[in-house]
Design a protein with these regions (language model features):
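Long, ordered, helix-rich scaffold segments
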Residues: 1-195
């Protein structure tokens, strides 16, 4: 019954672990309901919110269920920087070893929130172009506007030059081919005989 019930119906039920887990497993749930479910579940399981979120995100990523990772990620990046710093190693694992793009982006956003800057996360991401793409995609999801603004210079520098260990792709022969080829035929004159 909990799997098929709407979030509004779940909020009317007694607050149990199963109800809170059902709310946190849904996508497109209002943030205030997610916050309440996280706080309630953390209290019932006697865990802190960050470790609970990280275990849920890790389990969802491992099983390939990424539909609600962005919602859980929003809750994670709202957590205090001090609490996120305690889980720094787990955040780095999410950022560098996550299966889904959403998980890796969330990991980078949480690392930047924990550090209060993007320099360490940028250094970690500069190991490959895919990681760098994930880092860039994580920037808009940072909830702290001041931190997001401070990342402007780092993002801007990537517009003109890649980190030294990453080289631009060599131009291939395929880039020298014309982009479009059009064949144009004039209509036949009306006084021509078809043979």
């Amino acid at each position: 019954a909990l799997l098929n019930a709407s979030v509004q119906d779940l909020m009317k039920l007694d607050r149990t672990e199963a109800v809170y887990e059902a709310i946190l497993s849904r996508q497109n749930v209002p943030v205030e309901y997610l916050r309440e479910a996280l706080t309630g579940l953390a209290g019932l399981q006697k865990k802190d919110a960050v470790s609970l979120l990280l275990s849920m995100i890790g389990a969802n990523d491992a099983s390939g269920q990424t539909s609600n990772i962005s919602s859980l990620g929003q809750l994670l990046t709202e957590q205090p920087a001090a609490a996120l710093k305690k889980a720094r190693n787990t955040l780095e694992d999410l950022a560098t070893k996550g299966k889904a793009e959403e998980t890796r982006r969330l990991g980078y956003a949480a690392i930047m929130t924990a550090d209060g800057s993007g320099e360490n996360a940028l250094f970690a991401a500069s190991q490959s172009k895919d990681s760098l793409r994930d880092w860039l995609a994580a920037v808009p999801s940072i909830s702290n506007a001041e931190l997001r603004g401070n990342l402007f210079s780092s993002v801007r520098s990537l517009m003109f030059e890649l980190p030294p260990n990453l080289k631009a792709e060599a131009s291939g022969g395929s880039l020298l081919q014309p982009g479009i080829a059009v064949d144009y035929f004039q209509p036949s004159a009306s006084n021509v005989a078809i043979e």
